[in-house]
Amino acid sequence: MTVGQSAVSLAIFMVMGAPQRKSRKRFSGSKASGGDPMYNSNRVRMLAVSYALPPALFPQAIQIGRLLTHMPAEIGVVCGDSDESATTGGFDPGFGQGFVFRESVRYRPSLRGFPATLARRFVPFFARVPDEYRPWVRRAEAALTSRLRETAFQPNVLVTFGEPMSDHLLGLRLKARLGIPWIAHFSDPWADNPFRRYEYLATFVNRRLEQQVVQNADRIVVTSQETLDLMMSKYPPAWRRKACVLSHSFDPSLYRAPTRTDGSLVVRYLGNFYGHRSPVPLFRALKLLLDADPQCLNGVAIELVGQMPARMRLHRSLRALPNGLVLLRDTVPYAESLTLMSNSDLLLVIDGPDDLSVFLPSKLIDYLGAGVPILGIVPPGASAELLTRLHARVADPREPKAVAAALRSAIAEAAQRRKSPRSEPWGDPAIVDGYNITNVSAAFSRLVSDLLADTGGPTQ
């Protein structure tokens, strides 16, 4: 073994720890201490691992919380418990009340703020193999083991949800410990994620860790066909056959009818900007429109709601625009974000420049529930494909003139739509309904049932 191989092996051991002895018990009915059945042995008993769950205000928390809430199963959950994020605000006050248990495991990063930024930049492996939540894995495993013993809950299927990808490292340990079928759900790519800062050794280790998860999981779930192709192309055909696509979802019951009374035409973007995902293509397009016709945006209000780095807030392309044309707003609670969507005339999806983007943002799926026209400033890929099927305007962020033309047309169409006294919800209902949580949760339920049928467990 070479020195380089030894370093990689040591790094992986430090991330994973010693393997756990595999249990031989599979699909046995749960018993209370007195021997009476506590849980229905004929039902799906799911153990879910998701660091991010409501009330944390992460898109992942909202999406996975919604999916678990709509699953017809007995569910025990292990999740994170930190003060690093705002709360969803109005997602569902009763979330988690139907769970068998919710084990919230406290985690506080060792470094925060500027020291953490420096460490990410200069310290090898810091928060990169796979992420800053790695120390949470063993704490969560210990807490979960105790909770399973206390409740006598014996799960017959394990589901892990990443991001963060440390959830899947916990999945590896639980798969070895419990010996039950395992579904690994990826909301984003892991080792191939273009938003990950490239560092050779960390990337190599992440590829090895991802490979272990893909090899040991019984099913792999991703949120777009493009992600499936990217992730699974490097694996044997037998592993690829374990993978499938399950989209994000929206809940139509959470939206309210528009209540606006002002006369301005509102164009909104809701979501965070970071990395290469930037509002600059929008700013440049607005400048092109104003240069061609200074009056063309009269009566138009543009709002960007969410976090934005200072380098983008101070960008010269924004400073070149008239004061008051673009309003920057901080992140709002989830329920309020849905209200803002419904009270918009045009919603924006913006992604970073790329030859092919595998990302299908959950915010885009939330937009579908609002029934409001959408403009995509996105490269070719998952978002562009969906928007094209919906006959939305789409422009590549690398082409300022194309973005300006699409924006001009989308605003004109939105203005015309406002004049209609009884506008129907925007979007082909046959396509939009495929992202309704009722249909998405039913598809996931079938996936779980099929897996358990293949492995000898209950399918209800």
What are these regions (language model features)?
Residues 12-17, 21-27, 31-105, 289, ...:
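N-terminal subdomain of nucleotide-sugar transferases
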Residues 166-169, 173, 201-220:
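Membrane-proximal helix-turn-helix segments that form the acceptor-binding/catalytic region
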Residues 178-181, 191-212, 252:
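Nucleotide-sugar donor phosphate/pyrophosphate-binding loop at the beta->alpha transition
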Residues 398-402, 415-450:
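A charged, aromatic-enriched C-terminal amphipathic alpha-helix characteristic of glycosyltransferases
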